[in-house]
C-alpha cells in the first residue's frame, strides 16, 4: 500500500484485480511430519474483492483437497510429507490449476498467509526443501502468468480477514475429514 499525501487515505498500489483467489493450508500435528501426516488446502475464488478483509465481492468457487504424498497417485505433484508448508504450496497449485481451467485472460491475484509458499510459488525464493513440489508449482505459475497478469500478496493469518479465514476453514475441515460449514452459517474464525 502507499499513502496518498493529499488526503491521507490508504490506497492499493494497483487496481483490484477481477479475480482474487485465497489459499490456505492446514496440517494436523505439524511436528515430526511424514507422508501419512494429514494435511489439506483450501481455495476460495472471489470476484470484485476489495482486499480489505470485510468479505466484499462475490464468492464464485470454493474447494478443499488433501496434500497427496504418494507418487503415482492422482493429484500427486511432488509433496513428500504432509505439513503446513506442503499444504500451502498445494493450495497455490490448486489456485493455479483453477485459473488454467477458468481460461480467462484478466488479472488475477492469489492471496495467502504464507510468505514461504507465495515467494516460492512465484519464483522469488529458491527452494531448499520440497523441491519437486516447488518446481511443479512454479511451472504452473509460469504457465498461468504467460496467459494473464498474475500476482500474489500476503494477508495476515487469523486476523478476521473473511476470505482468508474461509480458506483456512475449508483446509482445516478437510484435514479433519469433516464437511465445511455452509457459507451462510459460517462465521470468520470458526474452524
Question: What do the predicted segments below correspond to?
Answer:
Residues 87, 91:
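Loop-to-helix element that buttresses phosphate recognition and phosphoryl-transfer chemistry
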Residues 26-33, 38, 71-74, 78, ...:
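RNase H catalytic domain
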Residues 1-86, 97-98:
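RNase H-like nuclease fold core
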Amino acid at each position: 500500500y502507499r499513502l496518498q499525501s493529499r488526503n491521507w487515505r490508504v490506497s492499493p498500489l494497483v487496481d483490484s484485480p477481477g479475480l482474487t483467489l485465497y489459499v490456505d493450508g492446514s496440517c494436523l500435528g505439524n511436528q515430526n511430519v511424514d507422508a501419512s501426516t494429514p494435511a489439506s488446502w483450501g481455495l476460495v475464488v472471489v470476484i470484485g474483492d476489495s482486499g480489505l478483509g470485510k468479505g466484499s465481492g462475490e464468492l464464485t468457487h470454493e474447494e478443499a483437497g488433501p496434500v497427496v504424498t504418494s507418487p503415482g497417485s492422482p493429484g500427486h505433484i511432488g509433496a513428500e510429507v504432509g505439513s503446513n508448508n506442503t499444504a500451502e504450496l498445494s493450495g497455490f497449485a490448486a489456485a493455479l490449476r483453477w485459473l488454467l481451467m477458468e481460461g480467462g485472460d484478466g488479472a488475477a491475484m492469489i492471496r495467502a498467509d504464507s510468505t514461504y509458499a507465495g515467494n516460492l510459488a512465484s519464483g522469488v525464493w529458491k527452494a531448499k526443501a520440497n523441491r519437486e513440489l516447488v518446481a511443479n508449482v512454479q511451472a504452473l505459475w509460469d504457465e498461468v502468468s504467460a496467459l494473464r497478469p498474475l500476482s500474489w500478496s500476503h494477508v495476515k493469518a487469523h486476523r478476521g480477514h473473511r476470505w482468508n479465514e474461509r480458506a483456512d476453514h475449508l483446509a482445516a475441515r478437510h484435514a479433519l475429514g469433516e464437511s465445511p460449514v455452509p457459507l451462510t452459517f459460517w462465521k470468520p474464525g470458526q474452524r
